[in-house]
Regions:
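Non-catalytic C-terminal accessory region of glycerolipid acyltransferases
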Residues: 9-11, 34-37, 71-195
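A short, well-structured juxtamembrane/interface segment
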Residues: 1-14, 23
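Short Gly/charged-rich anion-binding patches and loops
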Residues: 3, 27, 53, 114-117, ...
Length: 195
């Protein structure tokens, strides 16, 4: 899948690279975007000192980090309009106003609508990538695949379902490396506590 990803970066359409919490997304970003301009959305930590440290280390490969707020979304849209790569961690739990419930491994999960909205506003191609840890700490294997076709649907429900199916497919390649502690189901459609 890397070939198709790199081919897509040569067009002026922009590329959305989904990087679920599997293995190490920073390794994925450094590897795939080493010589490609890219902008990555991230959730800033509450402590400025920690934020500065994290941003500095993640930016050393020329990766632009932008926060998950209005400014960040605007930066991401601008990057796509310039034909650049945008990295998004699609399994982050959004605020209620930034998501809709969609099945994730058979359970309703609050799913970000951002990717679906970006796809409708730009001609960007969507890929999903992971950097799987190899046994005995010998390194990582980068795997990149095109997102499920349904992600391009103008129907939000279909697009969100395809987004979650894309994430599920990646998780199933290395279940033990997914960050299950992330509590993807912490917000429920009926307000009850899942955890």
């Amino acid at each position: 899948g890397e070939e198709k990803f790199f081919e897509a970066t040569m067009s002026d359409s922009g590329v959305i690279l989904l990087a679920p919490h599997i293995g190490n997304w920073e390794i994925l970003a450094f590897y795939l975007c080493d010589e490609i301009k890219s902008t990555w959305l991230y959730q800033p930590p509450k402590f400025d000192l920690l934020d500065n440290l994290i941003t500095k280390s993640r930016s050393r490969a020329g990766i632009v980090m932008t926060p998950t707020n209005r400014t960040g979304v605007s930066n991401v849209l601008s990057a796509l309009n310039r034909g650049e790569v945008v990295g998004i961690l699609p399994d982050q739990v959004p605020p209620i106003e930034g998501g809709k419930f969609s099945p994730f491994f058979g359970e309703p999960a609050l799913t970000m609508t951002l990717v679906s909205k970006l796809v409708q506003r730009t001609p960007a191609k969507v890929f999903c990538g992971i950097a799987k840890r190899l046994p005995n700490g010998i390194g990582y294997k980068v795997v990149v695949e095109e997102a499920m076709d349904g992600i391009y649907s103008s129907k939000l429900e279909e697009s969100l379902a395809a987004l979650n199916e894309t994430i599920e497919k990646s998780i199933l390649t290395t279940v033990e490396q997914y960050s299950w502690e992330y509590k993807r189901f912490r917000k429920t459609s009926d307000g009850s506590r899942f955890y």
